[in-house]
């Protein structure tokens, strides 16, 4: 059985048969406020607890709230949480590559969100931004396989004809072995997590979780 890193959220871990698979890329997408960053932070916390001599590389393109991080991390050792805040798509690629060369003990890589800078640069030069995006994403799966750690990427979404999907969806769906869609419900804080793609678990399976001040439960 493939090793998994649990989120400690019952609904999420139940849907994923124990957590996020190691050695693969998992994609989480959903509208703003569905819990993508909270899930990424909670998984980061658990990675630090499970592998205290390893580091978590967290690429932040959204302006992560340090207050939110403190809420979810609690007394967890943040010295093992290495945040990368690139200024552009090309900087993201270069900085991530540099960090990977500096650290050989990694428990998790997170990119939150992977398509933020691409949307901006795509408006200016579609050809260059698409090529840079493909170059960046193409290094993630080999890294996950070689390092035997999970890579979690979150994605911004668009809506067309009533359907919600991630920007640059075709590239991301080809890259990702697991694809998860987070959905808001009418009850405040209640979310659905829907499994859109998995190599061994039933697709379109759904579980519930609650987005709280302390993370996802």
Regions found by a protein language model. Give the residues of each.
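Phosphate-binding/switch region of NTP-binding enzymes
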Residues: 143-217
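P-loop NTPase motor core
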Residues: 86, 96-174
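Pre-Walker A adenine-sensing motif
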Residues: 7-20
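A conditional alpha-helix N-cap/helix-loop micro-motif detector
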Residues: 5-9, 37, 89, 133
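Conserved P-loop
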Residues: 20-98
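Switch/connector loops and helix/strand junctions flanking conserved nucleotide-binding motifs
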Residues: 66-68, 92-93, 117-120, 161-163, ...
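Short, surface-exposed amphipathic charged segments that create phosphate/polyanion-binding patches used
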Residues: 94-102, 192-199
